[in-house]
Amino acid sequence: KKKEEKQIKKMVERNPMTVDFYKRYQEIIEEYNRGKDEAVIKETFRKLIELVNSFSEEEADTRREGLTDEQKAIFDILRHGKKLEDKEKNEIKKISVELLEDLKQEKLKVDQWADKSVTAAAVFNTVSKTLFETLPYPSYQTDEIDLKTNLVYEHLKHQYFGGGMSVYGQY
């Protein structure tokens, strides 16, 4: 149980779009705690196995997309709730990779960048400008780009600490 919980928390920490895994895990554990008969235990175990297999699918999806965990997190934020054609999906992948590379070159390396208003504004503006200039229209409208800008910025704020450190390691 502790191993799975640790793996789920790590996954959610690295990519907030995987929070559904954690919710499903909690539901399974609650279900287990409600009943202790053999049928409930077997069903709970089956669901736990299914959940662990879905972790593997998420990891395989990351590899299949040709992205790192940190790139996939941005990619997932940008594509969440969208039905994208392959061409658009590839554009979103490219945007995710290039935006992250650009920010990691300088802005995210500033110690405690999120606490410094000028640097934080520069990060936000880079995200906003990049998304407004590159996300495919009409698939992404102005209000959606505003939302995605805020989601990406919040993700960066919580995952990148500055000084070349992030939840993904040193960069």
Predicted regions and their residues:
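Catalytic cores and motor modules of nucleic-acid processing enzymes
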Residues: 1-171
